[in-house]
Amino acid sequence: MKEKELRLALVLFGGVSLAVYQHGINRELLNLARASRAYHRVEGPAAKQAPGHVYPAGAGADAWTAEVYFDLLKRLGRMVDLRVLVDVISGASAGAINGIALARALAHDLSLAPVTRLWLERADMQRLIAPEARAGKWDKWYFRPLLRPLLAWARREGMLETQPDPETLERALAFVRSRWFSAPLDGALLSAELLDGLLAMETGSVAAGSLLPSGTCLSLAVTVTDFRGIERALFTHDPPLLREREHRHLLRFACEHRRTGELDSDFGLDNAPSLAFAARASASYPGAFPPARLAEMDALLAARGLTWSTRERFLARNFAHYRASGMNPAEVVLLDGSVLDNKPILAAVGYIRVHRAFREVDRRLIFIDPHAEARVGQGAGSDGGEGEPGWFEVLRSALSDLPRHQPIHQELAEISRYNRQIRRLKATIVQSRPEVEALVERATGGALSGPFTAVELRHWRLTSTNMLGAMPLVYDPWWRALVLEALDFLAGLLGSLCGCARESPGARWLQQVVEAWAAHAGILREHYRIADDVGEDADMPAFARVVIRFGIEYKRRRINFVLHELNTL
């Protein structure tokens, strides 16, 4: 039976109003992943379609819809053996909190019920106001009679979508009467709540293990905004080097479920402080919460007598370029990720491009927005009407709404161009197949269909490759592209060993040194040719040995091509 994977990449937008909605979607995605794992716990189509193959009982109170997804997969299993997994997540602000919780649940098959309680019971604004920022009995008393007409005016100006209810009025009054000119909400309390929620996911977990199938990985990226920024080098013609400050930053986490059964995870219990800090930093809305710094999490853990055993690993993975620039990560001040990147679609696409598969994949990129249709053709500061907007509406939209509601047209257009390029490359491969098969037939003398040895296969491969040498217009540029790709990998490897950040002056210098060495050693040349009778790698010319040892991307493409051919059998 045909095997297929449905791989989901999630983009969780920022916005506290989306938080609970996104969390509900995440619970369903978690149950879908649970159902897929349960369906594939047996081998073979007959066993999977057996009447006794049902979703296991007692799988957890929050997994009640998983049985529905299990039955759906079983019904689809009559036609295709479908496996479903979430392997890419990116998020900003409140979306980052939800993305981190979902990634941890997927990586270790944990419950999201504690996160549900976090949103519904612990995320109340009045709880999050810092004790020293709370209004006294007579603090800003004049807002009591003014708030209702003020909100009514804001509604007329288009600043509010609906008329606030009494509960909202009470919370709005508490907020506006709290401390001014300093963040009123308690950042340390938010860190504590996030840490508690992530730790509590271990309680009531469904089962030990992971929802990631063997041989797959899960990648997570959350956006943060570096208040001071970091210098980036730009290599231009004149002047040769420019510098600018980059304030956008991604915090990255990953989990790999190896085929040996081992789980290399950034989402384990010992990583909870790292995850809580990332969530706190990405959700530090300017003006409401104070900026996030590492010292806040250090103080919280010290007060509880806990350790942050993965702190150095977290910093090495996410702040290596800061250290390479002479900056101390402890001094970095982080703001809400939605300030500069509220919809991190390209971060998700970057992961999609490097995730490998062993069977046919149906890829879906999902961005969660409960009002997607309503927003088509509607600007961030518009109610869809006509006429001149109010003064405060314009000010609010310019300073807040418009920067946080940038359209995703460019990102989706880039994805469309990428998909179109893939389709064209596939069509080119299909059209060239007859000529390739004829060339291989001539090189092997028709012996490829019978038994052969590894030595014969090696000889045929060199012979067929060298037959292209009769077309130097194609052959030499092809070899040169392979050599340069291998040299890029070598330069990147040396750069990582030397602690050079990508695109840094040091990395640029290493690249130039490697290419100069390759030209001097005859690795970069005008013409490329390998003798047909070469028996060992050591007898290969220098350029071929470089490709054999460092042409990792070339080898990956070859393996992927073989896997694609096997899946078509």
Model-derived regions, located:
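Small-residue-rich anion-binding loops in enzyme active sites
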Residues: 1-13, 17-27, 31, 35-36, ...
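Extended hydrophobic secondary-structure segments that form protein cores and membrane-embedded regions
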Residues: 8-12, 47, 85-93, 125, ...
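Flexible loop/turn segments at secondary-structure boundaries
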Residues: 17-20, 96-99, 228-232, 340-343, ...
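Patatin-like phospholipase
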Residues: 19-196, 236-245
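Active-site gating loop/helix substructures
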Residues: 166-181, 215-354, 399, 403, ...
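Extended, Lys/Arg-enriched charged tracts that mediate electrostatic binding to polyanionic substrates
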Residues: 185-211, 216-219, 227-230, 341
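Hydrophobic, mid-to-C-terminal alpha-helical segments
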Residues: 358-362, 374
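Charged, amphipathic alpha-helical linkers/stalks
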Residues: 365-368, 375-499
